[in-house]
A protein has these predicted regions:
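Transmembrane helix-loop-helix hairpins at the membrane interface
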Residues: 119-238
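Alpha-helical transmembrane spans of integral membrane proteins, capturing the lipid-embedded, hydrophobic core
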Residues: 30-38, 42, 69-76, 107, ...
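Cytoplasmic juxtamembrane regions at transmembrane-helix boundaries
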Residues: 90-105, 175-187
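N-terminal hydrophobic or amphipathic segments with adjacent small-residue motifs
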Residues: 13, 20, 26-27, 35, ...
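A broad, low-specificity signal for short, low-complexity segments enriched in glycine/proline
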Residues: 58-59, 112-116, 130-132
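N-terminal, membrane-interfacial amphipathic/helix-forming hydrophobic leader that caps
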Residues: 1-102, 119-123, 234-238
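Helix-boundary and loop/linker segments of multi-pass membrane transporters
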Residues: 18-23, 57, 97-103, 135-143, ...
Length: 238
């Protein structure tokens, strides 16, 4: 007698996994989730933009802060909703599916390897093409504490949840490691193009390394920490 297929397979979704990847959604949902996250951030920022009336000039500091927070919120809410299977799973289950997990001390060696690989790539890239340039968005957020909140804390956490936890995690259920890491990194880099095209290749490599780090350590937390470190250095250099 044939066994009845799990409900997840009947619904076209990957069955829950004991090991990596932890995602219970597939590649299509992962890509769609990024689009939904961007749309959510845009919709959440509309009131601030309308009230600020940017037709009179650049957005005010308050409006810029709200837009940045709205973007981060979109990158957090949509992955969380997808990970809960639209409310079926608990908060803890959703976080674990997104890679928000503890990690072993051995993860430190992979973090150091990731930093080393990125520094080598950045050095070679700068030697060949010159130092990448990005728009200085920090000043548009006002005081230093607010800059730290948005650039060093909110951005790394929300982007790792969205691009590594949701996107890479979902792609990994259907694609080989390198391919999934590359696709997620390309999306991550492309979405930063508005702040400076020359910085896109290093950001793509950074996203690629962080995806591999996630799989090696089984947690997005090491990637969040390195992302925070990277943004801290960038903020100090501006």
């Amino acid at each position: 007698m044939e066994a009845t297929p799990p409900a997840e397979q009947l619904a076209g979704r990957p069955a829950p996994r004991a090991g990596f990847p932890y995602a219970t959604w597939g590649a299509q949902m992962a890509v769609g989730g990024v689009l939904l996250a961007l749309a959510a951030g845009f919709l959440l920022s509309i009131p601030a933009v309308v009230i600020d009336n940017p037709a009179e000039g650049d957005l005010s500091t308050a409006a810029n802060v709200v837009v940045q927070l709205a973007t981060a919120l979109g990158f957090l809410l949509v992955p969380f909703v997808i990970a809960t299977r639209w409310g079926e799973a608990s908060v803890g289950q959703a976080l674990r599916r997104l890679g928000v997990r503890g990690f072993r001390p051995a993860a430190l060696k992979w973090m150091l390897a990731a930093v080393g690989a990125y520094l080598v790539f950045a050095g070679v890239y700068s030697a060949l093409f010159g130092a990448p340039e990005q728009e200085d968005i920090a000043e548009s957020f006002g005081t230093v504490p607010v800059q730290v909140l948005l650039i060093v804390l909110a951005a790394p956490i929300s982007e790792e949840v969205c691009f590594r936890g949701m996107l890479f995690g979902g792609l990994r259920t259907r694609m080989p490691r390198i391919a999934a890491a590359l696709v997620s990194a390309l999306v991550f880099g492309a979405l930063h193009a508005l702040t400076g095209l020359s910085a896109v290749p290093p950001l793509i490599f950074f996203g690629f390394v962080l995806a591999l780090l996630y799989e090696k350590t089984g947690s997005i937390v090491p990637g969040i920490l390195l992302h925070m470190l990277n943004n801290s250095v960038a903020l100090l250099g501006q």
